[in-house]
Amino acid sequence: MLSQKFSPRRSGRHVTGSFESSFRFLREEDADVLRIRRGSMSPEPENKEKWLKMSYEAEKTCLLAPQESQTPCVCHTANEKYEIPGMGDDSVLEMLSYSKFSDLETWLCMPSTLLPRSRDSVCSLPPPSHENGTADTDRESRPPENTSINLSQCQERKTHLLPPSSLMPVSASPTSSTPLRTTSTPLPKPNRDSGQGGVSVRKRRRLAASPGGLHWDASGSVLRDHDRGETPSLSEVKRFPRSVDSESLVPELWRDRAPLRKTISIDDRLLQQTPREHHRLLSRLERGKKKLRNINSLGATGRYETHKKSESRISRLAQRLNQRQSDAALIKDFRPLFLLSGSAGSSQSLDRNFSISMSQQMQNLQLTQSKKGAGPASPSAAKRLYRNLSEKFKGSHSSFEDAYFFGRSDRIRKVSNIQSSEALFEAVEQQDLDAVQILLFQYTADELDLNTPNSEGLTPLDISIMTNNVPIAKLLLKAGGKESPHFVSLESRDAHLSALVQEAQRRASELSNQVMRESLSLETSDKEKQLKAWEWRCKLYKRMRTGFEHARQPEAPLMVRLSVTGSTTLTVSFQEPASMNSAVVTKYKVEWSCLKDFSLLAGELILENLQSLKCTITGLTMGRQYYVQVSAYNMKGWGPAQLSQPPSAVPSNWKDCDGRESRRRGHIEAMERLLQQVRATHQHYCCGDTSKLQNPSRKQSVSRSLKHLFHSSTKFVKSLKRGVYIASVFYHKDSLLVTNEDQIPIVEVDDSYSSSLMQDFLWFTKLSCMWEDVRWLRQSLAVSTSSSSTLQSRQKMLAAAGQLQNLLGTHNLGRVHYEPIKDRHGNVLLVTVREMDSLYSFFNGKWMQVSKLQSQRKSLSTPEEPYALDILLITIQDILAYQRRSQHRLSSGLYLGYLKLSSSVDQIKVLVPQRMPNMLCHTKIRDNWNVSRDEWEWLQSLSGPVEVERADQATGCLLFSELQTAIKSLLHQINLPLHQAKHFRLYTHEVLELGHNVSFLLLLPASDDVCSAPGQTNPYTPHSGFLNLPLQMFELVHFCSYKEKFISLYCRLSSVLDLDALITQQAFREAITDSEVSTAKQRHQHILDYIQQLDEMWREVRWITNALQYARYKQPLGWVPITWLVDVSVEPPVQKNDSTSSNTDYVPTPSPSPEMRRRKPTIESQPGSDEEGCSEVFLPTDSDYDSSDALSPRDLDLVYSSAQDLSHQAVHVLSGSAPDVLQMHDLKYSVCSKSILETESCTKDLEDLSLSSYSVKTTDKPSRSKFLADAPTKRKLLSKSHPQRSYFGGPHRWLRVQSESHTPSLSEGIYTRQSDIDLPLETPLSIPHSPTTSYSLDEYRQPYRESKPNVRRIFVESCSKTSPCRDAPHWEEEEEKGSRGATASGARPGYSSTSEAQDVDSDEQTNEQVSEILSSTL
C-alpha cells in the first residue's frame, strides 16, 4: 500500500478517505484547468483568485498557526524557534519534521492526474527493487550537507520533473513573468497504534515527511533536488496517455525511485500526451538513470539520525547563524503557487531555469559540495561546524577551481584555528591534560591564539595557574603561553575574578527562575542545559578566586650558575624554585650590576620563554666585574632574589691574555681573493692557447676510434679486469642506485696505475669539493703524450669523473671514501658516496635494496679470488655508516680530546672513534665552550703539586673539578688506568676553537708514544669502536663538518694549483727559445707563489700539526702533566693480561679490504715481528700504499663487551653487509682424518668466564700440529667441506669461519679449544672427549656471575687430548704446566690473572696458529 509505505502505522481508512476527498477536489478544478489551457494561459479572474486564495490559506495555516495547537507552525519567531530540543545542533529539516501540517493533508495526498491509475494501483506500490540497494546505500552514506544551501537552492530552482506517483499534488497556475512557488505539508504523523504496512523495507533511519521538496525512493531514502538535476521537463511526463499500459510500464520504470513530489507546475499540455513524447521520456530516463544516482547529495539528514552534540559556544553560535539563513530561505519559499514563465506549448527545463535563476555563488557552492567525498551518515558537531563555517568564509569566486583550490587552505586554516582555540579553552577548563598535549602538538601558538583572551578576559594560562593545575600550566608555558594583559596588578585580578563570579551567579539565578516558570514548555531542556553550564562555570570561577587568594609569592630559584661565554657576554642558568607556594612561576627576572649590593643596576632582563631556563647577557664591557641575581614571579608577584654561583664574573676570553687572534679570521676572504687571481691567470693563458687544447682531444678521438668502433655511446663497466676505476655509490636509507644491469655505477680511469697512486688519490679527494668545476678543469688542461705520468693520470681522472657525471645526470658525485679498495687482480676502486634525500629517478639507473644486491653478487663472484667490487659489496654497510657518521657534529661545549697517531710506510694515521670519525677521541667537559681569561691564567700558572693543592682548596675555579672528571672519563674510554697515564700531559699552548661553538683541550700521551712507528710495541689496548684514519682524510672530513667554506675554498685552490704546477713545469721543460723559457718560468713562478700563499694560510688553520710539534717536546713547554691535576696514586697498579691474539696494532681500524695486517710483537708475547710467518695473510700490493694498513671495523675485538653487545654485533655483522657467501662453516685441513672432515666442528663461546681465581702461567703454547696427521701448506687453510655453501677460499683467510647454527660476532677472537670445557669448577668428573665435539661453560657461569668479574667472550675449539681429571686443583696444575689454557687477553685492569711472556719464534709458528689470526679477523 502506498499509504502504508509512507506512514506504516496509520490506518488505511483515514488515508483512503483523504484520497477520495483529493479526487473530488481535483475533478471540481479540472474544468478550470482546461479553460486556462484554451485561453493561452490567461486565467479567468475567479479561478485565479480561487487558486491564490487556496495557496494563501495554506501559507497562512503554515505561518500563523499557534504553538499550542496540535499542528505547530513551520517557522517560529526568533525567540521560539531556537528553543526546540536539539535545534542548536540539528539541521533546519529536522526542525521542519516536528510540524504536522494536518490542515494541508488532503491537498498533499491528492492523487496525480498525470498518470491516472485504478484504485488498486493508487493504494499500492511495488516492492523496493534490489537493484537500487547500492545506490540507496551510497545516498545514505553521503555526508549531510549544509541545510542552508539546500533550502536556498529550493528557493531559486524551477520545476523539477517527477516520475509518476499515486500521490502527486496538482496545482494549475496561470502564465506569469514572475514564477511563484508553494510548499505543501507533509503526511500526517504516523500513529504508533496502527499496524505495520505490508511492504518490507530495510531497517534504517529515514527522514520524516516534511516540506521543502523532499522525495522518497522505494527503499525509504531521501532524494534531494539536485539528485534530479538532469531529469526531463515536466511537459514530457504530462503527455503520458491514459491507458492501461501506463499502469504496467510506469511502476517498472519508477521501481527504483518512488518519489513524493510536493511542488509541481502544469502548462497548456497538461492533459495531452502523444506516444512519441512517451517514448522520448522513457529513453531519456533510461539514459540518465545511473547518472542520477551518482550525484552527491546536498540535503540534510533525517531527524532520527543521532548526532554528537557540540558543547562549544562558537559551534552553537555558528549553527544559529546558519539556521537564520535557512529560516529566511524557508519563509521566502512559502509563497502562492508559482507559475512557470515561458510561452504556451513549451515546457520549462529544469537545467535552463535553474542556471538562470541561481547566482554564481550558489553554483560554486553546489560544485564544491558535489566534489566532497562520501562520509559517515551522522557527522559530529565539529564536522558540521567545519562545513558551515567553511561555506560562510568562502565567499564568491569566479570559478570552481578558484573556490576549491586557492581559497580552501585559508578557509580550513581559519576554521581550524577557531575550533582549536575553543577546544583548548575547554580542555584547560576540564583539566584534560591529554587533550592539551594533542592540541599543542598539532597546532602552533599562533594557530591556537594561545595568548588571546576570551570573552571573559582570560587566557588558557590564567585558568591553569589560578586553578593550580601545574602540569597543564607548564605545558602552556613551554609552548609560549602568557598571562592576560588585563591583570596589571593584584587588585585588578581580584576585582576581575569577583566580577566573573557575580556574573555567573546572576545568570544562574535568572535561568533557574526561568526553568521554574517554564517547566512545561519546549524551552525547558535548553534552559536546563544553560543553567547547568552557568552553575559549573560559577564553581570554576570560585575555585579560581580561591586559588588566587591562597597563593603566595614564590621562593628564590635554585642552582643559579654564572659562566663566562665570551669577551662581552655572560650566561646565567638556574632551576625553578623548590616551592612555588600554590602558584606556578610564569617568568623570571635576571639583574646584573657592577656593585655587590645591587644599589645601582646595570641592567635587567625578563625571561618569559621558559623552554630553557638559561639567559645570555650581551653587550657587557670586557674586563669589568659584574654581579648577577635571579628572582621568580607568579600571580602574587616577585619573590626574593638569589645570587649566582660564583657571585660575579668578568667577561673575557683566553686569547685576551696575549692578544692573539683567531685562526680563522680573514682566511676565507684571502682565499677568495686568491681564487679570483688563479681564475684570471687561467683565462689569460687559455685565451691564446685554444688550439693546443683541441689537438690532443682530436688525436685521442682518432686513436680510440677503433676501440669504440662498435660502441655508440659510453656505458658503465660491468666487470673489473685490471686498472683504476671510479665507483659512485648513491644511497637512500637501505637502497642503492644501480645500473640497468644491477651493478654499481663504475667507470674506468686507466688500465694501470703508477707508484704515485696515493698522491693521485689525495688529489682526487680534493676534487670532490669542486665537482661542478670538472668540465672547466678539463677544458683548461692540455695534456700531450710527452706529459708526465702524474699529469696524464689526473687528466684521466677528470675524464672519468666527467663521464660518470654525464651518465648519472648530476654533477655532485658525493664524498670520496677515505681509502681506495684493492684486490689481487690489480684493480683499484675509488669510491664516492652520496646520500640522496629521496629515491630520485635517474635515466641510467634504478634503486635496489642492499641485501638484494649482495645476494645477487655472491653467485657471480669467484670463490678463490674476490674482486674489488666484491669487497665493496661486502663492506658496503661500513662504508655507508662511515659516510653518515662523518657528517655529524658535536653539540656546543668544551671537550677534552685525545691525540694519538700511528705511522706506516707512506702516511700517518689518527686515532678516531667509529661513531664520529671527523673528531678525535673525546669526552665533554662542560656545555660552555668558552675558556675565560682567569681559567686560562690558572692553567698557565700550574707549576707543581703545591698549585694543585691550592687549586683544590679554592672554590672559585670550577674548571679544576671539571678537568678531573673529564680526564678520568677519557682514560676509561681508551681503557687505560691512571697509573699507566702518569706521563700524559695537558696541551696548554692554545684552546682549539673548531667552529660551531665547539672548543677542545688536548690530552697528549708521553712524547715517545705520541706516534707509534711500525713494529713498535703497544703499551695498552683500548676498547673497541676506534679506527685509524689517514691524517689527510681526517682533516678533510673534520673541516668539512666544522669549517665547510674554508675547506671548500682550500680544496678548489689546491687541486687547481697542483694541476697548474704540473702544467707549467711541463711547459718549462718543453721551452726552446729564450722567450718561451722566460714566459714559462714566469708563469711557473706565479703558480709557486700562489701555492706558497695557500700553504701559509693552511698551516695557520691546520691545528693538528702545531699540537704534534708541542707533543714531541720532552721539555715542559706548552703542556702540563696530568699528575698535577689528577692523583694517580688513587688506583693501585694492576698488571694486565694479554694473549697471543691481541698482538695487533694500537687499535683495530676499519677497511674496505678484507686483508689481515702483520702481527706486531708485544713485550709479553713475541720479541720480534713475524715477517715470514705472516707473509701469506697479506694480499700482494702493487704499490707502496696498501689498504690493509687500516682494517675493517669488524676487526679484532679482544676487550670485554657485554653479552648483549656481542649478540647485537653478531646479528648486525652476519645479516648486514656480508652476504651469505661469507658465512663459512668449518675450519678444517684437507689432510685431516676423514671423520674430522665429515663432522662439523662447532664453535662455542665462553661468556663471563672468570680466571681471576687461578694463576695462569703459560710458559709454552704447544702447536696444534701435534695431534694433526700432517701440517698442511700455508695456502690451504680453508676447506670446502659444505657443498651447498659457496665462499671465498684459498689464501683469503680473512673470512671468519662460522657454523651455520652458531653465528657469533666476526670481531671476536678464536682460541684453542680446551679439552674438557664442560667441566665444573667444584665437582671432579672425567668424560671422554671427541676431537670434533665441543662444550661450553654456559651452564656453570651463573653461580660465579656475582663473585667474579666479567671477561669478554672467548671462542674455544676442540682438541684431541682430554683432561685426566676435572677437579679444580688438577685443573690449576694443568694450567700451570702449560696445557691448552684459554688466555684471557684484554682483561679489565684490576684482575689478578696474569700471563708470562711467550717466546715463540716466527719459524716455530704453525699453520694452526696462523689460522687463529686469520679466523679472528673479518
Curated annotation (Swiss-Prot):
Keywords: ANK repeat, Repeat. GO terms for cellular component: spindle. CDD domains: FN3. Residues 893-900 are annotated as: Highly conserved peptide sequence. GO terms for biological process: establishment of mitotic spindle orientation; regulation of establishment of bipolar cell polarity. The keyword Repeat applies. The keyword Repeat applies. This is Ankyrin repeat and fibronectin type-III domain-containing protein 1. It comes from Danio rerio (Zebrafish). The gene is ankfn1.
